């Protein structure tokens, strides 16, 4: 049953993740949760499901395309609304579904997680916004996301992430994992500043 529902969830997300690079976030995120939670007691089934389903609402075909609607779109609520049926269809243990929804609802940096499962997921998601991966994920949105019309928009977000996110990490394992990512993102932004010569646009 374990392999069945995990495979089912992975296949569902792989078929729905659009643009295609959105898919990589899920397996990377889950791998990070395993490193973060290596010496912690938590429910790996809950974290697995939440890691794979938490961003369903940002996929093309699930999010609204109208810019006005998109500006007020709550992708977390959408994921929480859709997740129960997906989990049921894949044979996920019904008694664990509420914990998955709680973890999804508390996974963003501004949230205050109320369980170890949610804390691990939130910390992992912060790591995905730092380092080389964080830079790639943000830059890939330029010209495709209404928030990112230019490289300047992307760099502003990356600088904000570098300044704000490290201090929001909760767990010691995550803090250690964050160190090289923080350094990598800082080096990248320094290089952009020195190479752009005031003409980044």
Predicted features and spans:
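Short, conserved glycine- and acidic-residue-centered signature motifs
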Residues: 22, 72-76
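A short glycine/serine-rich beta->alpha loop
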Residues: 17-19, 67-70
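Amphipathic alpha-helical interface surfaces
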Residues: 79, 83, 96, 100, ...
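His-Asp-centered metal-binding catalytic motifs of divalent-metal-dependent phosphohydrolases/nucleases
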Residues: 44-67, 75, 79, 83, ...
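Short helix-capping and hinge/turn segments at secondary-structure transitions, especially at repeat
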Residues: 58, 84-88, 92, 105-109, ...
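Acidic/histidine metal-binding catalytic segments
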Residues: 41-49, 90-103, 117
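Divalent metal-dependent phosphate-bond-processing catalytic cores, especially two-metal-ion Mg2+/Mn2+ enzymes
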Residues: 15-42, 53, 109-201
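An amphipathic alpha-helix signature
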Residues: 2, 6-10, 30, 76-84, ...
């Amino acid at each position: 049953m374990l392999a069945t529902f995990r495979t089912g969830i992975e296949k569902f997300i792989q078929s729905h993740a659009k643009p295609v690079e959105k898919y990589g976030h899920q397996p990377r995120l889950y791998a990070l949760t395993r490193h973060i939670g290596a010496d912690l007691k938590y429910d790996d089934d809950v974290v697995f499901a939440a890691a794979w389903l938490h961003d369903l609402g940002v996929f093309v075909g699930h999010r609204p395309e109208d810019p006005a609607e998109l500006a007020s779109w709550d992708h977390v609520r959408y994921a929480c609304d859709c997740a129960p049926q997906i989990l049921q269809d894949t044979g996920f243990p019904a008694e664990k579904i509420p914990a998955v929804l709680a973890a999804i609802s508390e996974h963003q940096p501004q949230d205050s997680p109320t369980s170890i499962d949610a804390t691990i997921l939130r910390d992992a998601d912060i790591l995905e916004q730092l380092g080389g991966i964080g830079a790639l994920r943000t830059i890939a949105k330029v010209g495709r996301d209404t928030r990112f019309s230019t490289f300047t928009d992307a760099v502003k977000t990356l600088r904000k992430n570098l300044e704000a996110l490290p201090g929001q990490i909760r767990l010691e394992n995550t803090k250690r994992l964050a160190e090289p990512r923080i350094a990598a993102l800082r080096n990248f932004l320094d290089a952009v500043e020195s190479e752009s010569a005031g003409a980044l646009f």
